[in-house]
Swiss-Prot record:
GO terms for molecular function: magnesium ion binding; manganese ion binding; phosphopentomutase activity. GO terms for cellular component: cytosol. This is Phosphopentomutase. It holds the Pfam family Metalloenzyme. It catalyses: 2-deoxy-alpha-D-ribose 1-phosphate = 2-deoxy-D-ribose 5-phosphate; alpha-D-ribose 1-phosphate = D-ribose 5-phosphate. It comes from Shewanella baltica (strain OS223). Keywords: Cytoplasm, Isomerase, Manganese, Metal-binding. GO terms for biological process: 2-deoxyribose 1-phosphate catabolic process; 5-phosphoribose 1-diphosphate biosynthetic process; metabolic compound salvage; nucleotide metabolic process.
């Protein structure tokens, strides 16, 4: 029985990539800087001491990062019995965003330029927002700027509740984000507004509209809920997910994967929120998955809760939780199963600002006859998609080289 399990540690980069200068990210290193902070006692909130990831280390994380940066991260070294194949991959795509990373690893790199709202204030064209408001029956909106999602709730959440005006904001990514209170504005109304916005954005080539629902009674206790929804463009070509689907296989999305691929190629969507629930759901789906199935999970908390919020201790604690549960996954794998752990970009919690960082991503692979050892530097995330195509004996993808 052949299956592939992809565990996407969203934003878990392993060092600045060769083209990082073009993004202002030279020196960024999500994994390395977390390990360094832990070793120096600077990440002892909710956890303490050096970063402890013994299972990821056995799969080759420390070695992959060493090959990426030229040095082992603090607390990681050669004194580990490797069980997995490891490498690090350069992104071909033009951006360092979520859709680009996901699409590329499924065999479809983004070789065009996304549209962006580059102005930090008055970010959105008036003709665009006028059309959105008219169609939605709204008389105004708040925000219209680049912002951190948590900060903008503190600044504008109470005014939003009083006025009923949605909060529009963006970032360095190709994204239009809309924050609304689940109770006072209504979740269905937010989703309808996002669907309208997605349609009106067609001429602008914006990658995603993101619904950002929140709850709470005031600025001191506003919090995002688990009902986020992404409205992505569809990939410009068939991904390996589509090809397996067309060949009669199954593709199970856990978390936000289905949204990122605009449901293309997805046969089942499983909703889960938080690291524990996402891991539980992934294990449950692997237990029930049959032959010719991909189970694909995005562990978004690493990015949304820890990377963007520059929470080093939280990121470290999340990684240690994830690592502690990996033996549960390994115990479910058959000899023909392929497990891949990777990331879609970096988001160094020690870096300036709140945006993603252009980094190499780890490629940790286990099973399917792979021998423990180095896969080297992969020229594209698409090597993952090509390897999956090879594993299932599908028609080769246009991009990528298989490491199987």
């Amino acid at each position: 029985m052949k299956r592939t399990i992809i565990m996407m540690l969203d934003s878990f980069g392993v060092g600045a990539s060769a083209d990082a200068a073009s993004f202002g990210d030279v020196g960024s290193d999500t994994f390395g800087h977390i390990a360094k902070a832990c070793a120096e006692g600077k990440a002892d909130i909710g956890r303490e001491g050096p970063l402890k990831l013994p299972n990821l280390a056995r799969l080759g994380l420390g070695h992959a990062a060493m090959e990426s940066t030229g040095a082992f991260a603090p607390g990681f070294g050669d004194n580990v019995e490797l069980i997995g194949a490891y490498g690090h991959a350069q992104e071909l795509s033009s951006g360092k965003d979520t859709p680009s990373g996901h699409w590329e690893m499924a065999g479809v790199p983004v070789l065009f330029e996304w549209g962006y709202f580059s102005e930090h204030q008055n970010s959105f064209p008036k003709e665009l927002t006028d059309k959105i408001l008219a169609r939605a029956g709204l008389d105004g909106f708040l925000g219209n700027c680049h912002a951190s999602g948590t900060t903008i709730l503190e600044e504008l959440g109470e005014e939003h509740m009083r006025s009923g005006k949605p909060i529009f904001y963006t970032s360095a990514d190709s994204v239009f984000q809309i924050a609304c209170h689940e109770e006072t504005f209504g979740l269905d109304n937010l989703y309808r507004l996002c669907a309208i916005t997605r349609e009106e954005l067609e001429p602008y080539n914006i990658g995603r509209v993101i619904a950002r629902p929140f709850d709470g009674t005031g600025s001191s206790d506003f919090a995002r809920t688990g009902n986020r929804k992404d409205y992505s463009l569809a990939p410009p070509a068939k991904t390996v997910l589509d090809k397996l689907n067309e060949a009669g296989g199954e593709v199970v999305s856990v978390g936000k994967i289905a949204d990122i691929y605009a449901y293309c190629g997805i046969t089942k969507k499983v909703k889960a929120n938080g690291l524990e629930a996402l891991f539980d759901a992934t294990l449950a789906e692997v237990k029930s998955a049959g032959d010719n199935t991909i189970v694909f999970t995005n562990f978004v908390d690493f990015d949304s809760h820890y990377g963007h919020r520059r929470d080093v201790a939280g990121y470290a604690k999340g990684l240690e939780y994830f690592d502690a549960r990996l033996p549960e996954m390994l115990a479910l794998l058959g000899e023909d199963d392929l497990l891949i752990l990777t990331a879609d970009h970096g988001c160094d919690p020690t870096w300036q600002g709140t945006d993603h960082t252009r980094e190499y991503v780890p490629v940790l692979a286990f099973g399917a006859g792979l021998k423990a050892g180095s896969l080297g530097r992969r020229k594209s995330f698409a090597d993952i998609g090509q390897s999956i195509a090879s594993h299932f004996k599908l028609e080769p993808m246009a991009y990528g080289e298989s490491f199987l």
